[in-house]
């Protein structure tokens, strides 16, 4: 998770010649609580304002080309290659350098008018406000408001459904798959008006480098999982051989490759069951079921077939799950791909190029 944290006044003022324009012990206490034990990155000027001394009990990194007694990185890209989870603490140029990859912003707005010459760039446009908490003035600190923003992951085309960006942010972590930007890939690649087929999976692959945000799909070059191997085997028997195990080309043609749970912890299958995904995915299924165009829902196995009650208006194609435990009990020989194309053609829709 890439987070930026700062305090500002109502006009966006954050600094005055290298110092804070205010003294607010309550906000400094919150900053300490949020950053202790974490990796923090700052610009050279911010580090200089600290007397070139790292903040204690935090892993300090400075964005600079200069040689220092602490770890340095030359670019945001280098920082992201080294760390998955860090907090950007300033200054203005450093915030701007990380703007396009920020996933969360924690902003304290200090009440009052202050003198200064450094303003925070606009970092939160396009983000969603997650929370806003007001704190009254105390004996030592002016009143302040703490606002939490998080990245908006939901594609504009799907804006009529509940936005799950907060859930993505809450569940994200270095050992959670897929990465936040990939969690909604099924929706990123397939707009509502383009949906022709829905293939329901269960949860993402829990092995590093495999989860793509598309049910059953993995990047080329990875070892083929058993269920995908059986899907490709049935495809070859039904229509022909497919070289790629990356199913993105299906998604781009209108095949919504949707899992019923969209994130997972490394090495722990089904670990994010009952974490909040089920209501969201049920809403997506119901929304797609009410789209005007012909759509075919493909339900392989009991887990997917448990969602059949949500499908009231579209055609449903059912079979056993392609897992090695059940593929010989009603998946192999069902010819789903040619059947789907025949159903699409009969409905006046363009068939899918499965190969």
Residue ranges and their predicted role:
Residues 1-152:
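Enzymes that bind and transform nitrogen-containing heteroaromatic metabolites
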Residues 106-136, 314-347:
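Short, flexible loop segments at boundaries between secondary-structure elements
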């Amino acid at each position: 998770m890439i987070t930026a944290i700062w305090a500002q006044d109502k006009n966006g003022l954050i600094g005055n010649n290298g110092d804070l324009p205010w003294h607010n012990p309550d906000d400094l206490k919150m900053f300490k609580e949020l950053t202790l034990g974490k990796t923090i990155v700052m610009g050279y000027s911010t580090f200089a304002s600290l007397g070139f001394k790292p903040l204690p009990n935090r892993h300090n990194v400075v964005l600079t080309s200069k040689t220092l007694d602490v770890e340095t990185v030359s670019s945001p890209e280098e920082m992201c290659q080294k760390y998955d989870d860090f907090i950007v603490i300033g200054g203005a140029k450093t915030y701007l350098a990380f703007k396009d990859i920020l996933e969360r912003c924690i902003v304290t707005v200090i009440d009052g008018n202050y003198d200064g010459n450094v303003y925070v760039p606009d970092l939160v446009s396009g983000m969603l406000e997650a929370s806003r908490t007001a704190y009254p003035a105390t004996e030592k600190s002016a009143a302040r408001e703490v606002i939490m923003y998080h990245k908006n992951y939901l594609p504009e085309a799907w804006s009529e459904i509940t936005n799950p960006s907060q859930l993505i942010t809450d569940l994200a972590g270095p050992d959670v798959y897929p990465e936040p930007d990939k969690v909604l890939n099924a929706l990123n690649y397939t707009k509502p008006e383009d949906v022709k087929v829905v293939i329901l999976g269960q949860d993402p692959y829990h092995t590093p480098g495999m989860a793509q945000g598309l049910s059953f799909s993995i990047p080329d070059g990875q070892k083929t999982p058993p269920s995908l191997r059986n899907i490709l085997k049935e495809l070859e028997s039904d229509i022909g051989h497919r070289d790629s195990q990356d199913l993105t080309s299906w998604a781009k043609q209108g095949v919504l490759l949707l899992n019923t749970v969209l994130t997972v912890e490394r090495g722990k299958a089904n670990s994010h069951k009952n974490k909040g995904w089920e209501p969201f995915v049920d809403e997506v299924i119901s929304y797609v079921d009410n789209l005007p165009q012909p759509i075919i829902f493909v339900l392989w196995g009991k887990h997917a077939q448990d969602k059949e009650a949500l499908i009231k208006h579209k055609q449903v194609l059912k079979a056993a799950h392609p897992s090695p435990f059940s593929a010989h009990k009603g998946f192999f020989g069902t010819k789903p791909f040619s059947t789907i194309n025949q159903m699409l053609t009969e409905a006046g829709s363009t068939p899918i190029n499965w190969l």
